[in-house]
């Protein structure tokens, strides 16, 4: 009997590891939306070339993701496989954290496996490639799992780890991590004071101080300017959030546009089924005075509410469907503790909804690739990305911007050939952020992303434009740039959008493919 339990305890995590890896590997290798798909490709590679985010190029989020990707490139080689391996590993980490969280509540292995398989299906595979929002989402969930475990099971070492998770989640993406950190801090202070947990507080304080020292040491060792960090990672993103919450005309996403029945309920119906069920179960619990269960439910409800509101304010496709198995599992725990286990029907209904919704969103996001806006495209026309370079194998290339993938492949190959033959000091501005890696050359990227509405970097109308412009010109001068290449889909990246970034510099324009590919040589200005 003991050996059987041991085998189950070993076999289930192994199955989850294999499944979490393979489902993300399958999803991540189909389709491309360049601005998202390659967001951490060249930035991660640039770190290996000692060109660092914030210090040498503009980012406003994803700092930890960049360095983590650099680590994967260093350990496993600079290739697409290492890139997908990174995302698949985070999917494994999130799934295993969920598994061991549920194990604390003594649920049988079968339902835990169902919930975790659903989580692995609906979590990272919706994107498939490294994505700052999903890193922050998963690390924020892990923070919540650890906090609940620390509060209910009185484990001091977890209190020490929590501040490290704060840093990891926040420097993956500022939101939703900031809200989750605030939630945990609120409940933690209440826990320390109400229960007089001096030992818990001491471990938490030690973790806070040590993690802060490590972070400051990192800034010192990488020579990352504090001023640049504050502007790029704090002040500029605040202007984006303010615009969205205030529904300003220039905001990429407006809160007022999100407040409609279809968006609020239709897109999240399966989440809401479990959310409101758990909400009403929690209200009933107040009359039974089960403090631990009330605490669990309230923390999970507030966490999911934060994720839901944060999702509404994002310009991306929905990525929080993995809240479905999370909420379902918490309802399962409530039924079990409240002796609902005597009736099988509630559990059957839970499993049916979880399995059905998992299959539905697996088809829509992991197979049809809705996250990349290619759900209506025939995937059979996809082209092997290895035609561009063998290091992009086994990616299947198909994007929403070209009806024929071959045309986009040819455009990229022509650009690679021309840029490789140019031995001048170069800069490339593109969302095909893999040129530095494929050419094994520092191409002096300016940003991770390039949108012209103050949502990725300050443009002329933004109050921090001069800060950004100063950085651009400093990089141009320091790296002795002689020519700037622009590459994108039709009218995506035009020189007219960037020419005002440069001080007293004149250019000779050369158009290769109109509105798609051009290069601009720096020349002596004529009086």
Task: Give residue spans per PLM region.
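Transmembrane-helix motifs of polytopic, lipid-linked glycan transferases
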Residues: 85-106, 142
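Transmembrane-helix signature of polytopic, membrane-embedded enzymes
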Residues: 98-121, 291-296
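Membrane-interface transmembrane helices that cradle and orient dolichyl/undecaprenyl
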Residues: 103-106, 141-160, 193-195, 275-293, ...
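Membrane-interface alpha helices of multi-pass inner-membrane proteins
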Residues: 120, 158-176, 180-185, 210, ...
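Short acidic/glycine- and proline-prone juxtamembrane loop motifs at membrane-interface regions
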Residues: 126-136
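Specific aromatic-rich, kink-prone transmembrane helix
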Residues: 135-153, 158-166, 187-190, 326-330
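Short hydrophobic alpha-helices at membrane interfaces in multi-pass membrane enzymes
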Residues: 146-168, 197-206, 293-302, 343
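Short periplasmic/luminal acceptor-recognition loop of GT-C membrane glycosyltransferases, typified by
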Residues: 367-370, 379-453, 482-492
């Amino acid at each position: 009997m003991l050996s059987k339990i041991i085998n189950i305890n070993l076999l289930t995590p192994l199955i989850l590891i294999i499944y979490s890896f393979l489902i993300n590997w399958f999803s991540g290798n189909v389709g491309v939306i360049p601005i998202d798909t390659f967001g951490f490709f060249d930035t991660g590679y640039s770190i290996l070339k000692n060109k660092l985010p914030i210090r040498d190029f503009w980012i406003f989020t994803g700092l930890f993701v960049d360095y983590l990707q650099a680590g994967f490139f260093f350990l496993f080689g600079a290739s697409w496989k290492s890139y997908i391996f990174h995302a698949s590993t985070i999917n494994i980490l999130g799934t295993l954290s969920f598994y061991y969280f549920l194990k604390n509540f003594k649920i049988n292995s079968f339902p835990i496996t169902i919930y975790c398989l659903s989580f692995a299906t609906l979590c990272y595979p919706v994107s498939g490639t490294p994505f700052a929002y999903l890193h922050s989402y998963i690390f924020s969930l892990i923070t919540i799992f650890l906090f609940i475990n620390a509060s209910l099971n009185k484990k001091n070492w977890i209190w020490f780890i929590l501040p490290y998770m704060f840093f990891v989640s926040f420097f993956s993406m500022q939101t939703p991590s900031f809200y989750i950190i605030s939630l945990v801090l609120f409940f933690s202070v209440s826990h320390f004071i109400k229960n007089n947990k001096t030992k818990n507080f001491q471990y938490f304080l030690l973790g806070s101080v040590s993690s802060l020292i490590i972070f400051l040491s990192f800034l010192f060792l990488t020579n990352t300017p504090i001023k640049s960090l504050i502007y790029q990672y704090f002040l500029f993103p605040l202007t984006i959030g303010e615009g969205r919450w205030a529904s300003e005309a220039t905001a990429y996403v407006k809160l007022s546009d999100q407040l409609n029945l279809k968006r609020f309920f239709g897109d999240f119906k399966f989440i809401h089924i479990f959310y409101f069920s758990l909400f009403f179960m929690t209200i009933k619990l107040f009359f039974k005075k089960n403090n631990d269960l009330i605490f669990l439910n309230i923390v999970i409800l507030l966490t999911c509410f934060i994720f839901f509101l944060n999702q509404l304010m994002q310009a991306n496709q929905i990525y929080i469907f993995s809240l479905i198995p999370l909420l379902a599992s918490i309802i399962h725990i409530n039924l079990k503790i409240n002796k609902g286990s005597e009736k099988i029907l509630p559990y059957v209904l839970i499993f049916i909804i979880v399995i059905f919704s998992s299959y539905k969103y697996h088809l829509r996001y992991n197979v049809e690739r809705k996250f990349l806006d290619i759900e209506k495209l025939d995937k059979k026309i996809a082209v092997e990305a290895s035609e561009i370079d063998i290091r992009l194998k086994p990616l299947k290339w198909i994007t929403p911007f070209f009806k024929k993938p071959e045309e986009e492949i040819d455009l990229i190959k022509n650009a690679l050939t021309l840029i490789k033959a140019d031995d001048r000091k170069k800069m490339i501005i593109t969302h095909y952020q893999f040129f530095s890696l494929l050419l094994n050359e520092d191409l002096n990227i300016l940003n991770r992303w390039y949108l012209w509405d103050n949502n990725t970097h300050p443009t002329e109308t933004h109050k921090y434009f001069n800060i950004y412009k100063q950085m651009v010109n400093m990089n141009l001068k320091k790296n002795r740039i002689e020519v700037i290449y622009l590459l994108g889909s039709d009218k995506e990246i035009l020189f007219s959008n960037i020419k005002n970034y440069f001080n007293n510099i004149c250019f000779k324009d050369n158009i290769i493919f109109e509105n798609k590919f051009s290069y601009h040589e720096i020349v002596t200005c004529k009086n």
